[in-house]
Design a protein with these regions (language model features):
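Conserved P-loop NTPase motor core
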Residues: 1-613, 617-630, 635, 685, ...
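Extended, charged helical/alpha-beta scaffold domains that provide interaction surfaces
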Residues: 33, 322-330, 336-343, 573, ...
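Conserved tryptophan-centered aromatic signature that marks the ligand-binding surface of SH3
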Residues: 912-917
């Protein structure tokens, strides 16, 4: 801490101090609000809404609104928000990040700004990392909101459209980051406004904000369809790469690359996690695939497949980056160690790994819609978040999201002791010391949580503990089913738990054990079903007697265990509290801080220490070469720990290097995605205007004008006249649609004697006349089937434009992805790849817009609409049609149950309209 901070306090301390007056106002209202009846307290909600409508601001009513929530929390939840929680709530309302330590009650803090901002009626989104937390929090905190007269919604995977619309229409909506993002993309693929579920992005509170906005930032949300390309090339590329010789280096520079070209086919840069073919490797590829030059544009696809194959074999490691389970390659989250079901590496890397592991290679998918979390969350007018660890990423939150961080003091002083790291020369020496430390803690009953960076290491530590006769639990991506239960009991007397990274994050580790999970286990043993148990521990309103009885039984069982563990908790405190043992420093200091933060909740004692070796990846790849040489000269043996002070600077510098590199990678992803984001905003904004019923007839007329003008100007150029042959070539694709063949024949005969401008005007006049006739024919065909005052042609224009935009936008996404994959090579030509990507991406976007306009016009001229007479004849044919000789009578058929027509289903009359928009008599008799 610098001299300025010592004298004036840290920035966070100054920010917290500045809020003292507001918190004092809230606390001053406590007695007054405590005296209110339930009805009077609930009436505050309507009072606040009225004051906002009268011109007051949210800041004006904040003290009273927070005092209302505090009193409601006491009455409904039995919890009273502490002073520091009120401070956290104000920080969130201000659109900032509140860094609050584990166990400080972040879930309750969120209710304060959520209630205040929901009073505007514009909706508040509370975003969590998984469905379980979203459901649990919405039910538990939902009781408080409902008591105060606000509605609560829940958005999780598997809900139908109607349920989601209700959830988003609520005052406060809980859900996961994935579901909010996917719903946004699905809304922007809708053809009718009735299909939309979201109603805007006004205010979001993001729980575990660092996990969602930093760790997940590089992962794009993608809605995809089945691609058409064969998977054979992935297998061919993998078979080829399997025969190549690989060389691993800490980092690749130009000289190293030259020196290794003769003895390796590809080089793996362990620091950058990249793989590159050498000159020898390129030569082998050209021979194997019988091509002249791998760099030629026509070999781009092959080159891409080979590059992904060398990355799959050289960089991606089984049981670290992914696991193979039931014939599937499943990604392991590098930060939590959890399996990421349903997620796939993009750009063909997943298929390359499938080929490497000899499992079924899935077809490459076609991207229908995509957005990164970075750009999704930047849609919100106001964004805030909570986490226990954010300060180390302060620069990134500020640069990318314009969010600043305020560290909230703990309610009770932190009693955890963070010991200095111990560093060993080799991994073998380190793991021996790890087992000895665990044994020492275990003998005195001190619970230990061992944090590892991979499945591989967690299983190695587990084997060593088994050999040492130490009973323990292992928690990694392979054994995740009982994650919360195992982590919850990690604070019991003598417990030893080995876990990958932040497994079980979000579950409190209580000293002596977690009464809630112990009660669940007992009721399960007594035969209570998981379904009933979920209801028994839930908070949703119900009048079901079985559920009410189950809740009563659960409350009694939990109370019994709370009493039992009180004594055990005292024994654990005497033993020193929870001991956090890190087996390796993570690339990010934030992840290390998260691991430490599992101990010392709410003033409990605790201890933490990291055990390192010079062979750990972070020191091997990013540590100074000088340190390694120094250790050799000192002659330190494997079992003797090194002086940590000498290495502390090197370790921190190594972590800062990696953090800086990862930040630059995420920033680079954003620079590229910002190009797509600008284009996406244009497309989605125009789509929304069309969905909202904007009359686009004038836009269609402009498209028609532009399409016809481009026919002539695009082929005439500087010529005084257009030849007959050129005219024929220019207009062939619009023959039989915009123009009749006879019209084009007549104009073609006069083309070489008509100035281009005049020819363009005459063509446009003909096209406009044809369109007017087309409109008249369609209106006649649809007569009686449209709602009064609605035009069939206007509806057709709207639907066709949306469908064409979607088709071309999907193809454009793929084209931009391909452009980005190859744009990096521009750096060799002294060009900035991002600048080139922006320039070429803009050109491609303009070409797409022109193509959309022409295709929309063409389809409006060619789409077929059945006439009322055709529909009538078809119905008669269906009734009277017989095969073979009969007496001509219609045989009576058994009555069959026909599926009910949904309001949004196409009307069976053949009009092409939704049932609710169609007015035909045949299918609307009971309407």
């Amino acid at each position: 801490m610098g001299l300025f901070a010592k004298v004036f306090g840290t920035r966070s301390q100054r920010e917290v101090k500045a809020l003292t007056a507001t918190v004092d106002k809230i606390e001053a209202l406590e007695d007054e609000y405590h005296a209110l009846s339930d009805r009077e307290l609930r009436a505050k909600t309507d009072e606040f809404k009225g004051r906002l409508a009268g011109g007051e601001t949210l800041d004006d009513i904040l003290p009273e609104a927070f005092a209302t929530v505090r009193e409601a929390a006491i009455r409904v939840l039995g919890q009273r928000p502490f002073r520091v929680q009120l401070i956290g709530g104000i920080i969130l309302h201000q659109g900032r990040i509140a860094e609050m330590k584990t166990g400080e009650g972040k879930t309750l803090v969120a209710t304060l700004p959520a209630y205040l901002n929901a009073l505007t009626g514009k909706g508040v989104h509370v975003i969590t990392v998984n469905d379980y937390l979203a459901k649990y929090q919405s039910e538990w905190m939902g009781k408080l909101y409902k008591f105060l007269g606000l509605s609560v919604g829940l958005v999780i995977h598997g809900l139908d459209k109607a349920d989601k619309q209700r959830a988003y229409a609520a005052d406060i909506t809980y859900g996961t980051n994935n579901e909010f993002g996917f719903d946004y993309l699905r809304d922007n693929m809708a053809i009718y406004s009735s299909e939309l579920v979201q109603r805007g992005h006004v205010f979001a509170i993001v729980d575990e904000v660092d996990s969602i906005l930093i760790d997940e930032a590089r992962t794009p949300l993608i809605i995809s369809g089945q691609g058409e390309q064969s998977t054979q090339l992935y297998q061919l590329a993998d078979n080829f790469v399997a025969r190549l010789k690989c060389k691993r280096v800490k980092t690749v520079d130009a000289k190293e690359e030259e020196d290794t070209s003769d003895d390796a086919d590809y080089i793996v840069d362990e620091k950058a996690r990249t793989a590159t073919l050498t000159a020898r490797g390129i030569e082998k590829a050209e021979q194997a695939f019988n091509i002249e030059n791998l760099s030629d544009p026509e070999n781009t696809t092959l080159s891409h497949h080979i590059n992904q194959a060398i990355k799959a074999r050289g960089v991606m490691k089984r049981d670290i980056d992914y696991v193979v389970k039931d014939g599937e390659v499943i990604i392991v989250d590098e930060f939590t160690g959890r399996l990421m079901y349903g997620r796939r590496y993009n750009e063909g890397l997943h298929q390359a790994i499938e080929a490497k592991e000899h499992v079924t290679v899935a077809r490459e998918s076609k991207t229908l819609a995509t957005i990164t979390f970075q750009n999704y969350f930047r849609l919100y007018d106001k964004l805030s978040g909570m986490t226990g660890t954010a300060m180390t990423e302060e620069e990134e939150f500020g640069t990318i999201y314009n969010l600043d961080i305020v560290e909230i003091p703990t309610n009770r002083p932190l009693a955890r002791v963070d010991q200095p790291d111990v560093v060993y020369k080799t991994k073998e020496g380190k793991y021996k010391a790890v087992v000895e430390q665990i044994k020492a803690c275990h003998e005195k009953g001190q619970p230990v949580l061992v944090g590892t960076v991979s499945i591989e290491i967690s299983e190695l530590v587990s084997k060593m503990l088994t050999r040492a006769g130490i009973k323990h639990n292992v928690l990694n991506a392979k054994h995740h089913e009982k994650e919360a239960e195992i982590v919850a009991q990690a604070g019991r007397f003598g417990a030893v738990t080995v876990a990958t990274n932040m497994a079980g994050r979000g579950t409190d580790i209580m000293l002596g054990g977690n009464a809630e999970f112990m009660a669940k286990a007992e009721l399960r043993k007594k035969g209570m079903s998981d379904e009933l148990l979920a209801e028994a521990t839930g908070h949703a309103e119900t009048d079901d007697q079985e559920i009410l009885d189950a809740r009563k039984l659960f409350a009694e069982t939990e109370a019994k265990f709370k009493e039992e563990i009180r004594e055990e908790a005292d024994r654990v405190r005497e033993a020193g509290g929870l001991y956090i043992l890190g087996t390796e420093r993570h690339e990010s200091r934030r992840i290390d801080n998260q691991l430490r933060g599992r101990a010392g909740r709410q003033g409990d004692p605790g201890e933490s220490r990291f055990f390192l070796s010079l062979e750990d990846d972070i020191l091997r790849l990013f540590g100074s070469e000088r340190i390694q040489g120094m250790m050799e000269r000192l002659g330190v043996d494997d079992d003797t720990p090194l002086d940590q002070k000498m290495l502390s600077g090197a370790i921190e510098n190594a972590q800062k290097q990696v953090e800086s590199r990862n930040f630059q990678t995420r920033k680079n992803v954003l620079e590229y995605d910002d190009v797509m984001n600008t284009q996406r905003e244009v497309i989605y904004k125009q789509r929304r205007q069309v969905l909202d019923g904007e009359d686009i007839h004038a836009a269609i007329e402009n498209m028609l004008t532009g399409t016809v003008a481009n026919l002539v100007s695009g082929h005439a150029g500087e010529q005084a006249h257009l030849s007959g042959e050129d005219f024929k070539a220019a207009t062939a694709h619009l023959s039989g649609s915009v123009f009749t063949p006879k019209q084009l024949e007549r104009f073609g005969a006069e083309a070489d004697s008509t100035p281009p401008a005049k020819l363009s005007d005459e063509l446009l006049a003909a096209a406009q006349e044809n369109y007017a006739q087309r409109e008249q024919a369609i209106e006649q065909a649809m007569a009686g089937r449209m709602e009064p005052g609605r035009s069939a042609m206007r509806e057709l224009e709207r639907v066709i434009l949306l469908r064409v935009v979607d088709e071309y936008w999907m193809d454009h996404i793929d084209a931009m992805t391909e452009l980005r994959q190859g744009i990096g090579l521009r750096a060799y030509g002294q060009s900035d790849p991002v600048v080139e990507y922006k320039r070429e991406g803009f050109d491609m976007f303009e070409q797409m817009i022109a193509a959309i306009q022409e295709e929309t016009v063409r389809r409006l001229f060619t789409v077929r609409v059945k006439t009322n007479e055709e529909i009538r004849r078809e119905r008669v044919a269906k009734i009277t049609g017989q095969s073979g000789g009969t007496d001509g009578t219609v045989k009576k058929q058994p009555v069959k149950k026909v599926a009910k027509i949904g309001r949004n289903d196409p009307c069976p009359c053949g009009s092409g309209l939704k049932w609710k928009k169609c007015t035909c008599a045949e299918y609307h008799k009971d309407a």
